[in-house]
Amino acid sequence: MTESVRLPVARLKPSTVALPGSKSISNRTLLLAALSDNACEIHSLLKSDDTDRMLEALDKLGVQIEYLAEDRLKVHGTGGRFPNRTADLFLGNAGTAFRPLTAALAVLGGDYHLHGVPRMHERPIGDLVDALRIAGADVEYLGKEHYPPLHIGERQDNGERVIPIKGNVSSQFLTALLMALPLTGQAFEIRMVGELISKPYIDITLKLMAQFGVQVINEGYRVFKIPADAHYHAPEHLHVEGDASSASYFLAAGLIAATPVRVTGIGANSIQGDVAFARELEKIGADVVWGENFVEVSRPKERAVQSFDLDANHIPDAAMTLAIVALATGQTCTLRNIGSWRVKETDRIAAMANELRKLGAKVVEEAEAIHITPPETLTPDAVIDTYDDHRMAMCFSLVSLLGVPVVINDPKCTHKTFPTYFDVFSSLTETAE
């Protein structure tokens, strides 16, 4: 039987939340540190299913890792060559581990088997594999063409130095290629084919690579130039920012409940694109205060939450939270340019539409957009399915701030990025039933 949690009608208390470390930054940092020519102590690392899969994989590849505290460890770099050239790697449903490791191992060569949970085998990887093959990599599909699981063999340097890659399905493919190609020591040019989605995630990658000593020239997100003789050299200490996507639930709560909520671990200078979520809240009625290491959202009770029609390509993960905020507006709201939702942990457009309808909302689903019209009164005690998707569970917790209780199935799916989410959420609220 599916485990579930019932959230009663809740009242938000003025609150401060210390965010867990960013998933995107944590897994990129672990891989870059493992490929560096020195040791790196990483602080505030996210403890979650996705980072556990990356750490397990690095261990199987022969990387020495010292666990110093719950959220602090030291990675001893391998100088850009993993000691173990044969490994069977199970990577769960962790795209931030699967895609970058695929590219790094394909560029280095060896005898590797990469696989995950059934949903991971439904998430496309063909655009990345096509690019890696142009660079001489030996990557074989073990099941359906263009999807994991994969076998990786020895790379043959074919002299090709200009690599085209599509960027309209997932920016993680470009991230993976950017992080892997410096391991060759050769100069490369990566050329985008068609539109590149989720550019802020590429900014995270480029900024982290620079912190590890590799400067990539970005020519308008169309061409990326990797210098010859590049190698990774880690900072002695690196602090992982709080997760800006996870911040979205608490910031949205502050707007919905007209109660001040401060999140710490991100701020005005964050390298994560999802901090722009707070700016979107500002446009629809929030008061936002920015600090160096915090963002605070509130709303005067007399000011209504405004409806919106938003191109959300720049904040694909945090935009899911806006689908719940739409219920507080009383008017039709639209999220556009969210086609990447279809190939995430689940088909998030379909999942979001299904579950919003259980609350009484009218939802029109398009290939790359969703239109949400809230009902006069939300349906109480709706049972929300979460599709093994951490963000579905966290988003729908906010319904309890809208005057109705809600039941969330499989709340433990938040272990992917935020294992303590429901404990933290309940600590910020009091029952109003």
From Swiss-Prot:
The active-site annotation reads D317 (proton acceptor)
* Pathway as given in its UniProt record: Metabolic intermediate biosynthesis; chorismate biosynthesis; chorismate from D-erythrose 4-phosphate and phosphoenolpyruvate: step 6/7
Q: Quickly give the catalysed reaction.
A: 3-phosphoshikimate + phosphoenolpyruvate = 5-O-(1-carboxyvinyl)-3-phosphoshikimate + phosphate
UniProt key word Transport: no
Q: Which UniProt keywords apply?
A: Amino-acid biosynthesis, Aromatic amino acid biosynthesis, Cytoplasm, Transferase
Q: Which residues participate in 3-phosphoshikimate binding?
A: K23, S24, R28, S170, S171, Q172, S198, D317, K344
Instruction: Quote the record's binding site residues for phosphoenolpyruvate.
Output: K23, G95, R123, Q172, R348, R391, K416
Question: Out of the domains of life, which is the source?
Answer: Bacteria
InterPro entries reported in the protein's UniProt record: Enolpyruvate_Tfrase_dom, Enolpyruvate_Tfrase_sf, EPSP_synthase, EPSP_synthase_CS, RNA3'P_cycl/enolpyr_Trfase_a/b
Q: Does the keyword Manganese apply?
A: no
GO CC: one term? cytoplasm
User: What compartments host this protein?
Assistant: Cytoplasm
Gene Ontology biological process terms from the UniProt entry: amino acid biosynthetic process; aromatic amino acid family biosynthetic process; chorismate biosynthetic process
PANTHER family reported for this sequence: AROM/DEHYDROQUINATE SYNTHASE, PENTAFUNCTIONAL AROM POLYPEPTIDE
Q: Which family does it belong to?
A: Belongs to the EPSP synthase family.
Q: What does this protein do?
A: Catalyzes the transfer of the enolpyruvyl moiety of phosphoenolpyruvate (PEP) to the 5-hydroxyl of shikimate-3-phosphate (S3P) to produce enolpyruvyl shikimate-3-phosphate and inorganic phosphate.
Q: What is the protein name given in its UniProt record?
A: 3-phosphoshikimate 1-carboxyvinyltransferase
This protein's species is: Neisseria meningitidis serogroup B (strain ATCC BAA-335 / MC58)
